[in-house]
A protein has these predicted regions:
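Start-transfer (signal-anchor) and selected internal transmembrane alpha helices
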Residues: 1-33, 127-130, 137, 143, ...
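Membrane-interface transmembrane helices that cradle and orient dolichyl/undecaprenyl
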Residues: 6, 139, 178-194, 204
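Transmembrane-helix signature of polytopic, membrane-embedded enzymes
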Residues: 19, 24, 132-154, 187, ...
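Catalytic lumenal/periplasmic loop and adjoining terminal transmembrane helix
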Residues: 35-41, 251-255, 260-271, 342, ...
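Transmembrane-helix motifs of polytopic, lipid-linked glycan transferases
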Residues: 119-139, 177, 181
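Hydrophobic/aromatic-rich transmembrane helices and adjacent perimembrane loops
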Residues: 168-171, 204, 213, 297-310, ...
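Transmembrane-lumen/periplasm boundary regions of multi-pass, lipid-linked membrane glycan transferases
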Residues: 50-64, 89-92, 98, 203, ...
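Multi-pass, polyprenyl lipid-linked donor-dependent membrane glycosyltransferases
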Residues: 45, 117-124, 143-154, 158-177, ...
Length: 535
């Protein structure tokens, strides 16, 4: 990014060495942390379809490499059969599934299939953490880089998505890298920056429709900071080459690229009609479109308070010189862009912070800048041991609570709420969605289900029957259990996605004591009930 840091970090090779060590250390720490409990997070609603799709990609690749009829493998019919499988719940372009197929092929035998698939988002997350540390350190110094990486690592909901084999962590990492490369190319040119921007943008496009929006906040930023014509030319050059990358990595586009693009855009813009997903927000259920302030409120109540304060500090201290603070300006534009995007009438906004996850690395950078400003202020007043003690106290005040909360919330990362709303109990009382993606159906809970339910038990499940059939297919849930999606049955398992509750689920949830429950700080996330219909 910019060449002049706000704080002194050394010069030349020494400075570069420390940035490299910081980035590598942050990425390694992220990898070790997530690896330690990646198997503890429940298999999420979408993952079984992605597992199946990745397995089909593995089989197709094996046929292409060593099969007897390689020509037919490349036919439009065979490609559509494999790469367009399960479009209703598996509509996204394939890069994240290709990554899952690769990591499971490499490590599945050693780690198990689920952990092998989940290695892909973990690697993307580690790369993202290292990149955030690098950018923060390059722009504002080592303190900023380290604090930015720590801030992102200590956002429980972001950390949770690093455990889950889905689109969200890959597109978040690729969005950040594409933005980083594009800004660097606009400001300084260079083959490396261009290559980073092109490949990251191309892969983002082929991961999720969201990837197509990468240039929008960059253009808005360039209108303020780089109005010369060369900026537009640079963005267009990157976009054109990125489309070529997207074409190469998406076999569905090989035979009919225009039709593939049209279908992707159409599916993405019609989600409210084809697959409306309900959300519980501030005590009301919304079938698809939420109030405009949902993304803003969710940001404020799902990021640890210390990190929010540092982010506000970093933003506020940059405002007087924001015209010269190009990275801070970019971060502000990125966060506001996602808030504005999700406020639009036709934008999907379900599933907590999942659909605007790419905003959080930029918020983390602002927090890193805030930490750098705190240390700079201390340096003006203190020296030696006093400075060290004060800096340590700052870390404790701003980051230690976030660390303790993140550790305590495991493995229910996606249910985290901060003190502004009263934590998890306060969020439940104020009518927020407490869980949504089946991540609370942990291996430990499934094991207890297997112990409690009698042989050949009939079990109705809400809101999804297919999810538990998939658990049986994965060997997690006993296969003699008969799964139903209709009552009456002797047993009823309710997942606490309250936006989808009918009056039946509300009555059971409020009035009946479960046989087995998943609880977080006194709030029920899932419960197994004996069903006794009332007359």
């Amino acid at each position: 990014m910019l060449e002049t840091p706000m704080t002194e970090t050394g010069s030349g090779r020494t400075d570069l060495m420390w940035r490299m060590l910081l980035s590598l250390g942050a990425a390694t720490l992220a990898f070790i942390w997530v690896s330690s409990d990646v198997a503890n997070v429940g298999i999420t609603w979408d993952e079984p379809a992605y597992f199946s799709s990745a397995t089909r990609i593995q089989d197709w690749t094996a046929e292409l490499v060593s099969g007897p009829d390689r020509v037919s493998v490349l036919s439009a019919e065979r490609i559509e059969e494999v790469w367009d499988w399960g479009r209703t719940w598996n509509p996204h372009p394939p890069v994240y599934k290709e990554a899952m197929a690769l990591t499971e092929w490499v490590a599945g035998d050693a780690l198990g299939s689920v952990r092998g698939f989940r290695l892909a988002p973990l690697l993307f997350f580690s790369l993202l953490i290292g990149a955030v540390a690098w950018v923060g350190a390059r722009e504002w110094g080592l303190v900023a880089g380290g604090a930015a990486a720590a801030a992102l690592l200590l956002m429980p909901r972001v950390l949770g998505h690093a455990h889950i084999a889905a689109t969200d962590m890959p597109v978040t990492a690729l969005w950040f890298l594409a933005t980083l490369g594009t800004i660097r190319f606009i400001e300084h040119r260079g083959v490396g920056a261009y290559a980073l921007a092109v490949f990251a943008f191309g892969l983002a496009i082929s991961t999720k429709f969201t990837g197509f929006l990468v240039p929008v906040p960059i253009v808005l930023w360039a209108l303020v900071y780089h109005r010369r014509k060369g900026s537009v030319t640079a963005i267009v050059a990157i976009g054109a080459a990125a489309l070529a990358v997207a074409y190469l990595v998406n076999p569905l586009a090989w035979h009919q690229p225009v039709d593939a693009l049209r279908q992707l855009v159409g599916d993405s813009l019609r989600r409210g009609d084809s697959v409306p997903i309900a959300t519980y927000y501030l005590g009301a259920s919304y079938s698809f479109k939420l109030p405009w302030h949902h993304a803003i409120v969710m940001t404020l109540v799902t990021v640890p308070i210390g990190i929010l304060v540092l982010g506000l500090w970093g933003t506020g201290s940059a405002l007087p010189r924001l015209r010269r603070e190009t990275l801070a300006g970019l971060c502000v534009v990125e966060v506001i862009f996602f808030w504005a995007l999700l406020a639009l009438p036709n934008s999907p906004n379900h599933d907590g912070v999942r659909l605007f996850l790419p905003a959080f690395p930029f918020l983390a950078l602002l927090a890193g800048r805030g930490a750098s400003e705190v240390v700079t202020a201390l340096r003006k007043r203190l020296r030696g041991a006093e400075l060290g003690l004060a800096s340590a106290c700052g870390v404790i005040v701003f980051l230690l609570p976030a660390y303790l909360q993140t550790v305590a919330i495991s493995p229910y990362y996606l249910s985290y709420y901060n003190e502004l709303i009263g934590g998890v109990p306060g969020a439940e009382q104020r009518g927020m969605e407490m869980t949504y993606w089946y991540d609370a159906i942990t291996p430990a809970f499934v094991e207890r289900l297997n112990e409690i339910l009698p042989p050949d038990a009939e079990l109705a499940t809400f809101p999804s029957q297919d999810y538990f059939l998939a658990l049986q297919g994965l060997g997690r849930l006993r296969d003699d259990i008969r799964i139903s999606d209709t009552l009456p049955t002797p047993y009823y398992l309710i997942y606490g996605r309250r936006g989808m509750f009918t009056p039946v689920e509300w009555q059971i949830y409020r009035d009946v004591r479960p046989l087995l429950t998943v609880e977080l700080q006194g709030v029920e996330l899932a419960g197994l009930y004996r069903y006794q219909p009332t007359d």
